Amino acid sequence: MSNDNILKNIHEINLSYLLLAQELIKQDKKVASFRLGVCEDTLNKISKLSLSELIKLGAINQLICLLRLDDEKVINCLTRESRVDELQQVHTGIMLSTQLLRSHKSNSNHALKE
């Protein structure tokens, strides 16, 4: 895949992510915060962006969404065969929410030090 195609794909993913984020925020802000892994201030800012601002933000050359599955053990656990799919989804939610809480605590502690 050429570099131009990669950048085009990144821009499309970014815009899709931002549009999805706005839709999630409209439906339920607390659920959006959990699913997106961002704080309320960020949700408020994203919800107020116009389409032209979303397009501009989506056109940066880096992915704006973060892969929250950044631990090999977590990935292995979540991709393992499960006899009960619903249980696997609950387990995934627990793993991601725990990771989100750790992230927020770390950010809060960092902000207090400044």
UniProtKB/Swiss-Prot annotation:
Single GO MF descriptor: DNA binding
GO cellular component terms listed in the entry, alphabetical order: cytoplasm
Location relative to the cell: Cytoplasm
A single GO BP: bacterial-type flagellum assembly
One Pfam assignment: FlhD
Domain of life: Bacteria
Keyword field: Activator, Bacterial flagellum biogenesis, Cytoplasm, Disulfide bond, DNA-binding, Transcription, Transcription regulation
Function: Functions in complex with FlhC as a master transcriptional regulator that regulates transcription of several flagellar and non-flagellar operons by binding to their promoter region. Activates expression of class 2 flagellar genes, including fliA, which is a flagellum-specific sigma factor that turns on the class 3 genes. Also regulates genes whose products function in a variety of physiological pathways.
Free-text comment on this protein's domains from its UniProt entry: The C-terminal region contains a putative helix-turn-helix (HTH) motif, suggesting that this region may bind DNA.
Protein's name according to its UniProt entry: Flagellar transcriptional regulator FlhD
Organism: Wigglesworthia glossinidia brevipalpis
Gene assigned in the entry: flhD
